[in-house]
Structure formats: C-alpha cells, structure tokens
C-alpha cells in the first residue's frame, strides 16, 4: 500500500493511503473516493498532510460532492475542513465531546443520524451509527456493492483501541453485531487491505473481545485488587510490552463494562472482582 497512489477497487470505489504509517495506523489511513465526475464523495480524508491533500485533489480532478468522515480522530478527519473549503463542498459526519483525542476542526455542515442516506450518481451510502471506538463513529454501507467503509470500527491486521470515556467496550461489541443486520459482503477498513468476509471478521472480533474480557476477570482473581499497571501485565501477556500503555485503555474499557454488569468494582483506581 503505497501513499499517494490511486488504487481502483471497483467501478465506483478508489483508495488512497495517507503517508502516516505507525503502530496505531498500520500502513496509513485509507481515504476512499466513491463515484466519478462531479459526484465524488471523499470518505475519511485523513490527516492534514499537504502531499496527501494534493493527491486527493488530483485523484478527483478538483471536483467532489461532499467530504464524509467516519469519526474525528486526528488520523481520519483533519484534512476535511481544508478540502471542503478548497472544493466548496459540505462536510458530513458527527461530532463528540472533546476528550483530548478529537479533531476539533471538523464541524459538519450535515450532522448525521443512523440510517441517513448519502446519494450520488450511481451510488448510495447508508450511514450506520457504530459507537464503541468512539461515540461519534459511523460506518457507511455502499448499498450497490455490499461494501462497508468501516473506519476504525474494523481494521485489517489488528484490533482497535477503545479509549474511555468517548469509547465504550459494551457499545463496541453491540456495534460489531449490528453490522450483521445489514447485507454486507466485504469491509473497506480505515487501515489495511479489503476484508472479503464481513460476517466472519465480525464474529472473530467479538470472540476475541470476549476472550480478552475473560482474561480481565481471570487477572482480577489472580492478582487480587490491583491497579491497571499490575493488571495489564497479566491480561495482555501476549502483547508487546511497548504497547501496554495503549492496551491499558482497552482494558479499562473492559473493566468499565464489567463494572456496569456487576462483575467488577473500583475504589481509588484499584479494581477487584465481584462475586464468584
């Protein structure tokens, strides 16, 4: 996946990869161009990197109909306001409270609701509210192809980090299962290559999250009342310790879910299991 190179996925969809590779972004953020001519939706324009913005403008020949974002993390939406102004098109998406992880430059002209339709010449995107990774996250189903643009709801090659309070493990698992209610064949993730089997991927991710939740409970019982630093070593013993600071965020999301279900309790940042 080479930054700046347009990759044609179908008659309706092209992809550009932003030059922002890293542990959390994989090969870089995927920007998708849906449609052709004057009816091009720019989906997840990515970070405000000049070379990437120019590549997007060149790929759509300076013409677009809207800029659409899955969510407002800094690797997905900062280029939106720049492109919207330059191409004189509206921004579409949703905002959330500032939790120090959001792109505050994204102020949509059209604020989405679940099941809203975005339509162009020969294509229709159905907005699917998928809170979890963050509470303003949306996926977009290209109805003509059964292809869902998943942002950070589903990534190829890794699981996504859930960061409370904007992120919720309980909501994330429910939102994964929600995709199974739609006629989805494949996943176009925010990072990485196309995933051809949406149902199989969703089922795998749900199993993984529930397995990790089981390890959280086992860890609580093994080490007794403990803080996040003590727990992460046990719960994420299969993860590179260099990533444990990120892992603690998802683990906290698991703990909050367990607390809401009456299986864990916390006092002064010390967590413990509740019941048998």
Task: Tell me the role of every PLM-derived stretch.
Residues 12, 56, 191, 216, ...:
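Residue-level signal for inorganic ion chemistry
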């Amino acid at each position: 996946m080479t930054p700046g190179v347009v990759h044609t996925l179908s008659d309706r969809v092209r992809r550009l990869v932003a030059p922002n590779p890293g542990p959390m972004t994989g090969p870089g953020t995927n920007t998708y161009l849906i449609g052709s001519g004057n009816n091009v939706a720019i989906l997840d324009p990515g970070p405000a990197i000049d070379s990437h913005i120019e590549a997007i403008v060149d790929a759509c020949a300076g013409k677009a109909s809207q800029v659409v974002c899955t969510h407002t993390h800094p690797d997905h939406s900062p280029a939106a306001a720049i492109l919207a102004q330059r191409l004189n098109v509206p921004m579409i998406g949703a905002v959330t409270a500032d939790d120090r992880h959001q792109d505050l430059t994204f102020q949509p002209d059209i604020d989405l609701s679940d099941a809203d339709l975005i339509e162009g010449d020969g294509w229709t995107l159905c907005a699917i509210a998928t809170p979890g990774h963050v509470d303003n996250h949306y996926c977009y189903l290209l109805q003509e192809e059964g292809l869902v643009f998943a942002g950070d709801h589903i990534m190829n090659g890794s699981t996504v980090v859930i960061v409370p309070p904007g992120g919720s493990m309980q909501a994330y698992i429910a939102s994964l299962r929600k995709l199974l209610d739609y006629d989805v064949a494949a996943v176009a993730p925010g990072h990485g290559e196309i995933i051809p089997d949406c149902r199989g991927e969703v089922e795998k991710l749900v199993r993984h999250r529930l397995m990790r939740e089981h390890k959280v409970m086992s860890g609580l019982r093994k080490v007794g009342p403990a803080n996040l630093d003590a727990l992460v070593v046990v719960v994420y013993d299969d993860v590179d310790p260099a990533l444990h600071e990120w892992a603690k965020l998802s683990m906290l999301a698991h703990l909050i879910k367990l607390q809401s279900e009456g299986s864990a309790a916390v006092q002064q940042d010390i967590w413990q299991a509740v019941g048998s």
